[in-house]
Amino acid sequence: MHTRFQAIWSDLSPQLQQALTPYLEQDEFPAMFTAEQVNALKTQLQCNDDELALALLPVAAACAVTPISHFNVGAIARGESGHFYFGANMEFAGAPLQQTVHAEQSAVTHAWLRGESRLVAITVNYTPCGHCRQFMNELNSGTHIAIHLPGRKVATLGDYLPDSFGPKDLNITTLLMDKVNHGYQIDNTSQLAQQALQAINRSHAPYSHSHSGIAVQMKSGKIFQGSYAENAAFNPSMPPLQAALIALNMAGENVMDIESAILIEKADSLLTQWDATQATLTALGCRQIQRVTL
């Protein structure tokens, strides 16, 4: 079992401990449950989707990286597929607070990077901040996505974000989590570069058209992708590096163990991710950083 779960293990009920042990004891627990696993857990615990997601919040929150606030937030994104995806907040010492990732952003991005096509609900242990409400407004689920909180009645994103400003106000029809492939190609055939290529081809940038993607390789040799996810309100956009950091953290890797990275973006883009990416990776101890332009 990953050490991060050991700290909260005694806080879980004996029944939940027994149900989760076969999964969390896996060396590479992916911080998600498939629909089949969700159904098995519900049967064993005699609960429904909502109750299971709420029970899993402490486990998701244990994935938080909070060297600044020491305030752990967990989230569960529930896909139309029936899969459950963990999310947790992340902070990076030595980098600006603007690089912080919120738990809801983490869960949504985790689901997106794993190929989920639509979300039906987000369960989180604290009320979503305005930043996260706006971030979720970019989803193809729209304002109908359900928001679940401990001790609260279920509400929709529309309830939390009335009179919202979103993609439709800018006549954007391709939304976050819609399947896209921008068709970019590069000559670099290395595995890391090709993973970054996959990431940029999945990126969501309908406002600036400044597509970008990154791949990071860990000291363990594992590679993780991150795709840029733009937002109608601009500021809540998810940089590609943060998306990759979410992916590696959910997989149980340490953000300080990144060995190398390749960022791909368009040479003529209105925006660049390079400076912020380089600065944050440097703060995390990574020195082998390459930029490829299209």
UniProtKB/Swiss-Prot annotation:
What organism is the protein native to? Answer: Proteus mirabilis (strain HI4320)
Please list the residue ranges annotated as the CMP/dCMP-type deaminase domain.
48-168, 187-294
Q: Which UniProt keywords apply?
A: Hydrolase, Metal-binding, Zinc
Q: Can you tell me which residues bind Zn(2+)? A: H102, C129, C132
The Gene Ontology biological process annotation of the record reads: cytidine deamination
Q: What class of enzyme is it?
A: hydrolase
* Required cofactor(s): Zn(2+)
Q: Which GO terms describe its molecular function?
A: cytidine deaminase activity; identical protein binding; zinc ion binding
Q: Which gene specifies this protein's sequence?
A: cdd
What is the recorded function of this protein according to its Swiss-Prot or TrEMBL entry? This enzyme scavenges exogenous and endogenous cytidine and 2'-deoxycytidine for UMP synthesis.
Q: What is its EC number?
A: 3.5.4.5
The similarity annotation says: Belongs to the cytidine and deoxycytidylate deaminase family.
Full protein name: Cytidine deaminase
The UniProt catalytic activity note for this protein reads: cytidine + H2O + H(+) = uridine + NH4(+); 2'-deoxycytidine + H2O + H(+) = 2'-deoxyuridine + NH4(+)
The UniProt entry annotates the active site at E104
